[in-house]
């Protein structure tokens, strides 16, 4: 038996645009129904199945709540595996990556919290724009390469956003 579709586990149709509040609510309801405490007196097999179901729900939720992971999953569902370490043939984006990294380093060196906040706002706007672009093209077979390019960009910006959060924590201490 294969792994269940992440979307189907939450009674959702595969789509990039997902109501994250609704997803979170469904996740909490479903995970409560398979909580280990509910199976404490159940046979070992039922306990194991509940634990497996909880793990599947968690994996599905973690994937669907993250825009880059959800985008990658949608491409995979449609039969297009994206190589994990694909060479990025996107010189414009490579230049943008270098510029963003340099800017983040400068903000770190100067411990500029206001600058970090501004950088973070720009990053969120860039992420939102990529998400809009991906939503418009992911299910169009003729725009597959564009969708893959956008996923790579989304993954980079997501990683950069994590680094910004870590920098904020260090600067707040």
From Swiss-Prot:
InterPro entries given in the database record: DnaJ_domain, HscB, HscB_C_sf, HscB_oligo_C, J_dom_sf
Gene Ontology annotations of biological process type: [2Fe-2S] cluster assembly; protein complex oligomerization; protein folding
Membrane-crossing segments per the record: none
Gene Ontology CC: iron-sulfur cluster transfer complex
Superkingdom field: Bacteria
Annotated GO MF terms: ATPase activator activity; protein-folding chaperone binding
Domain J: 5-77
Gene3D superfamilies tied to this protein: DnaJ domain, HscB, C-terminal domain
Disulfide bond sites: none
NCBIfam families noted in UniProt: hscB, PRK00294.1
Family to which this protein belongs: Belongs to the HscB family.
Assembly and oligomerization: Interacts with HscA and stimulates its ATPase activity.
Annotated protein name in UniProt: Co-chaperone protein HscB homolog
Organism name: Pseudomonas aeruginosa (strain LESB58)
Taxonomy of the source species: Bacteria, Pseudomonadati, Pseudomonadota, Gammaproteobacteria, Pseudomonadales
Gene designation: hscB
């Amino acid at each position: 038996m294969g792994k269940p579709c992440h979307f189907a586990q939450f009674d959702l149709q595969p789509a990039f645009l997902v109501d994250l509040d609704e997803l979170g609510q469904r996740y909490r309801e479903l995970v409560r129904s398979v909580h280990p405490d509910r199976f404490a007196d159940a046979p070992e097999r039922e306990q194991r199945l509940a634990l497996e179901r909880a793990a599947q729900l968690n994996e599905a939720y973690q994937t669907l709540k993250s825009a880059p992971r959800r985008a990658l999953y949608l491409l995979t569902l449609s039969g297009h595996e994206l190589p994990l370490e694909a060479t990025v043939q996107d010189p414009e984006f490579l230049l943008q990556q270098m510029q963003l990294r340099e800017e983040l380093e400068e903000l770190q060196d100067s411990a500029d919290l206001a600058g970090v906040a501004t950088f973070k706002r720009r990053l969120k706007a860039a992420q939102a724009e990529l998400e809009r672009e991906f939503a418009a093209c992911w299910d169009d077979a003729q725009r597959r390469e564009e969708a893959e390019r956008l996923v790579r960009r989304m993954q980079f910006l997501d990683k950069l956003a994590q680094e910004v959060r870590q920098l904020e924590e260090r600067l707040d201490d």
